[in-house]
Amino acid sequence: MANIKSQIKRNLTNEKRRLRNKAVKSELKTHVRRFRDAVDAGDVERAGETLRIASRKLDKAVSKGVIHANQAANKKSALARTHANLAAS
């Protein structure tokens, strides 16, 4: 446990941020999983819709500073590639 007042405040702030980031990441994983479920089911239309939502959530996570921009770009690219392969087949 910290003794310095400023560090005690930082610990509280860090805990709030950790919980907020955890919620954003959890929501992100949920939407990516929904996209993958739609792809596994072979539903092109639902996959396209969930891809848009997942991309939006990834961009939102970047703007909130939860994930790095390159990580979001890499994930969006992989999801789009998966959707394109599904639509082509």
Curated annotation (Swiss-Prot):
Keywords attached to this entry: Ribonucleoprotein, Ribosomal protein, RNA-binding, rRNA-binding
GO biological process: translation
Matches recorded under SUPFAM superfamilies: Ribosomal protein S20
Stretches the record annotates as Disordered: 1-22
Family (UniProt): Belongs to the bacterial ribosomal protein bS20 family.
Pfam family name, one: Ribosomal_S20p
Gene: rpsT
Xref: NCBIfam families: S20 (TIGR00029)
Molecular-function GO terms, alphabetical: small ribosomal subunit rRNA binding; structural constituent of ribosome
Summary of the function given for this chain in its UniProt record: Binds directly to 16S ribosomal RNA.
Protein name: Small ribosomal subunit protein bS20
An example Gene Ontology CC term for this record: small ribosomal subunit
Keyword Ribonucleoprotein part of the UniProt annotation: yes
Polar residues bias: start-end ranges: 1-11
InterPro entries to which the protein is assigned, alphabetical: Ribosomal_bS20 (IPR002583), Ribosomal_bS20_sf (IPR036510)
